[in-house]
């Protein structure tokens, strides 16, 4: 019995002229009196392997009755294909049905809307589009780890359950074992001291604060894990559960942070072009016509840097009308970000040094006492895709900022401790993994780049 090989390898010519065994799912089947053609896919690549079955096959009648979606094992000889569009095909000597699929199988040979496919998220990975999405997602995730490993960064697993709200927005999912029907009370309020963690706990919104602690011991670290936001936003860009990449560097300022972000983003763009060519060609042809050219441009670009103040002036001089106002002290909206990167710069740009009152308490206050050492990377078609900053390493200044924005220092005593002994300038950034995959594939809805999306009123599967 031949050992199984993956269809990706068979299509590369492995086993050519010899007997091989492949296993996979039938994408399509065409039958006639003299021959049956099965398009077989096992998820290892975008392309299908054509299986040719002839009447001399003992199970030919059974093969002709196979339905789309059935799982089969095929043993046969891999040969050069006379047909155009494929190099090799498999002439079957034996076809065994492993799992039947009848006409009720939802993924029949027709075009399905993304909205419909979300309703069958347990089956959509078998479709062309989502097979490509999740191969790219897997490959890029591996590239993230490789990038940081090659540069000596320590991979840190930060906690998923936490009692701190890094962003201070209060959009945390709560974790409790208290009986919601009869919680213990103290002076009319829920007594969380009697909860499992003896405090009000939730799912993390970021691993940054804990990452900073490790950077003060290992210099360069990164986190890559799930994060959660209880934000009731039903938009194509928001999900309640998503993955974040968050590097942190000790002895680094804002410019070092921007340099790492540029190197990292260009690396990932180059990786997906080099490693996922077949899937990227599909996205370019069927999802986003200019995708490959746009990603190629970013991979080969030097990123511009623009002060927030200059960005505001450029926007004020714009000849287009914006939906949202443009004034110093207001945050940039997506329409502003896209105008800057697409019309003003014509490529990726870092906007730096934002007003401190629109940014988080942990960002380093600049000498003007009006701005903080923050940066956002803006890219064409998307706008902001990376956000980062130099962190405030001066204890008195950090305590003052926490007081300004109303962050309780008691819950972050450990974070303040990191500034008491051996504090260093340090910086880092965050990149939402799903938004990265959206950018690299041209997919326009975050629900379509994560296996089982979690959004308001939807946590099925």
From Swiss-Prot:
Gene3D superfamilies: Bira Bifunctional Protein, Domain 2, Nucleic acid-binding proteins
NCBIfam families: asnS (TIGR00457), PRK03932.1 (NF003037)
Pfam families reported in the protein's UniProt record: tRNA-synt_2, tRNA_anti-codon
InterPro entries recorded: Aa-tRNA-synt_II (IPR004364), aa-tRNA-synth_II (IPR006195), aa-tRNA-synth_II/BPL/LPL (IPR045864), Asn-tRNA-ligase (IPR004522), Asp/Asn-tRNA-synth_IIb (IPR002312), NA-bd_OB-fold (IPR012340), NA-bd_OB_tRNA (IPR004365)
Taxonomic source organism: Geobacter metallireducens (strain ATCC 53774 / DSM 7210 / GS-15)
Subcellular localization: Cytoplasm
An annotated GO cellular component: cytoplasm
Family: Belongs to the class-II aminoacyl-tRNA synthetase family.
Chief location of this protein within or outside the cell: cytoplasm
Known EC number: 6.1.1.22
Alphabetized UniProt keyword annotations: Aminoacyl-tRNA synthetase, ATP-binding, Cytoplasm, Ligase, Nucleotide-binding, Protein biosynthesis
Subunit and partners: Homodimer.
Top-level class of the enzyme under EC nomenclature: ligase
Protein name in UniProt: Asparagine--tRNA ligase
Molecular-function GO term, any one: asparagine-tRNA ligase activity
One GO-annotated biological process of the protein: asparaginyl-tRNA aminoacylation
PROSITE patterns, alphabetized: AA_TRNA_LIGASE_II
Enzymatic reactions: tRNA(Asn) + L-asparagine + ATP = L-asparaginyl-tRNA(Asn) + AMP + diphosphate + H(+)
Keyword Disulfide bond on entry: no
């Amino acid at each position: 019995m031949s050992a199984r090989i993956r269809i990706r390898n068979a299509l590369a010519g492995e086993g050519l002229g010899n007997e091989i065994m492949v296993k996979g799912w039938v994408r399509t089947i065409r039958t006639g009196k003299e021959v049956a053609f099965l398009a077989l896919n096992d998820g290892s690549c975008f392309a299908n392997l054509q299986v040719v079955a002839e009447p001399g096959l003992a199970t030919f009648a059974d093969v002709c009755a196979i339905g789309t979606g059935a799982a089969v094992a095929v043993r046969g000889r891999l040969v050069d294909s006379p047909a155009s569009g494929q190099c090799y095909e498999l002439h079957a000597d034996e076809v065994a049905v492993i799992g039947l699929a009848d006409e009720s199988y939802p993924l029949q040979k027709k075009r399905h809307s993304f909205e419909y496919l979300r309703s069958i998220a347990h089956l959509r990975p078998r479709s062309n589009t989502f097979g490509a999405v999740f191969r790219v997602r897997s490959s890029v995730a591996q590239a993230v780890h490789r990038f940081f490993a090659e540069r000596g960064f320590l991979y840190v697993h930060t906690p998923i359950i936490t009692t701190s709200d890094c962003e201070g927005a209060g959009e945390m999912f709560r974790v409790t074992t208290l009986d919601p029907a009869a919680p213990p009370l103290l002076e009319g309020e829920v007594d969380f001291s009697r909860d499992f963690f003896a405090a009000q706990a939730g799912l993390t919104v970021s691993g940054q604060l804990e990452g900073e602690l490790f950077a003060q011991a290992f210099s360069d670290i990164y986190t890559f894990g799930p994060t959660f936001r209880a934000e009731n936003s039903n938009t194509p860009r928001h999900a309640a559960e998503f993955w974040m990449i968050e590097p942190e560097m000790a002895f680094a300022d804002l410019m070092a942070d921007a340099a790492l972000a540029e190197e990292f983003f260009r690396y990932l763009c180059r990786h997906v072009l080099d490693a996922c060519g077949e899937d990227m060609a599909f996205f370019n042809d069927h999802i986003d016509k200019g995708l490959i050219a746009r990603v190629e441009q970013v991979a080969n670009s030097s990123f511009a840097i623009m002060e927030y103040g200059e960005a505001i002036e450029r926007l004020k001089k714009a000849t287009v009308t914006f939906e949202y106002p443009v004034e110093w002290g207001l945050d940039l909206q997506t329409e502003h970000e896209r105008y800057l990167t697409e019309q003003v710069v014509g490529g990726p740009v870092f906007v730096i040094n934002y007003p401190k009152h629109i940014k988080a308490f942990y960002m380093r206050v600049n000498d003007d006492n009006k701005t903080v050492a923050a940066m956002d990377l803006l890219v064409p078609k998307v706008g902001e895709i990376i956000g980062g900053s130099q962190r405030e390493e001066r204890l008195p200044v950090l305590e003052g900022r926490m007081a300004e924005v109303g962050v309780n220092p008691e819950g972050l005593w450990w974070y303040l401790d990191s500034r008491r002994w051996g504090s260093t300038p340090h910086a880092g950034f965050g990149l939402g993994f799903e938004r990265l995959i959206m950018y690299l594939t041209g997919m326009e809805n975050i629900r379509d780049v994560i296996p089982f999306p979690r959004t308001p009123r939807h946590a099925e599967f």
